[in-house]
Swiss-Prot record:
Belongs to the paramyxoviruses nucleocapsid family. Disulfide bonds: none annotated. Keywords: Capsid protein, Helical capsid protein, Host cytoplasm, Host-virus interaction, Inhibition of host innate immune response by virus, Inhibition of host interferon signaling pathway by virus, Inhibition of host MAVS by virus, Inhibition of host MDA5 by virus, Inhibition of host NF-kappa-B by virus, Inhibition of host PKR by virus, Inhibition of host RLR pathway by virus, Interferon antiviral system evasion, Phosphoprotein, Ribonucleoprotein, RNA-binding, Viral immunoevasion, Viral nucleoprotein, Virion. This is Nucleoprotein. Pfam families: Pneumo_ncap.
Amino acid sequence: MALSKVKLNDTLNKDQLLSSSKYTIQRSTGDSIDTPNYDVQKHINKLCGMLLITEDANHKFTGLIGMLYAMSRLGREDTIKILRDAGYHVKANGVDVTTHRQDINGKEMKFEVLTLASLTTEIQINIEIESRKSYKKMLKEMGEVAPEYRHDSPDCGMIILCIAALVITKLAAGDRSGLTAVIRRANNVLKNEMKRYKGLLPKDIANSFYEVFEKHPHFIDVFVHFGIAQSSTRGGSRVEGIFAGLFMNAYGAGQVMLRWGVLAKSVKNIMLGHASVQAEMEQVVEVYEYAQKLGGEAGFYHILNNPKASLLSLTQFPHFSSVVLGNAAGLGIMGEYRGTPRNQDLYDAAKAYAEQLKENGVINYSVLDLTAEELEAIKHQLNPKDNDVEL
């Protein structure tokens, strides 16, 4: 069966049906949600730093703290607006810094803690106590701790959010199958930061963000808007530059993702990649625009459940063979496919076409200007013969 015979769903009718709705729904964010403002940003950044300097840190709450930091950069008002625009009923909890005194080994100690509904005073104090142990050890080893190794370095919060930027691109897979790729990428782009901080453990931090995004989907909307706002703001630190690169690459600015689907288990890459880079593909763009109107995870899962959209009209591409093979690989057609294909005709057509292109040597790897990392990912995905691949 030819790809050209596979028909799209009638998205226009669906769109008209949804547009005609006179009602909206309200989702709940839970009992209350902490909405920190700019004034506590420095303290939350320091909390992130305490986790980073702690050797073998427990990162159970790092995802949550990272999101609190992102919200403090957006500000309380914008955070609430983002949530309300996404259909959430928000009972906002203001966040302040207070002083807490506690007896530690017979000695009264003073701690500054945040008035959070989501993170108890006890947890915050434990994070600080553990970080103090590591800091004492650093003082013994280094004599004096340089500013970039300290817990109050201004980029601590953004270092943690770089891992969130990697995690968010993998959510549409519906599982944590992208964790290995997140760890590998984090080890590469944050290698300098890992030399600074012994508590920067990509696997543990990534799992913490997975947990937060899975349990609290409203944070996904907040993070996407934060990422766009952060990336569109000029200037900033080196780590802010890294974050913008990771975030914008993940959201479709990188054509390698579009062509190869190496990271296509995140449907968000395909969706925004096609819509922004290949606007001439009217049928595909129609579906993607429709999915964007659905918004949030609903739109991404719509595309996940309709993989045919990303495999149609591909003959219009200058390097259409590469794109077909890339999308086929990304959808699991050339790699591992989990579960039963939702559209057997599409699956068979795409698989046959992609295999034919591969066998006939139609794909010209050398014109794609791949980095060593991308080449490694493609080798892993497609297992080409060594002489097929040139850099």
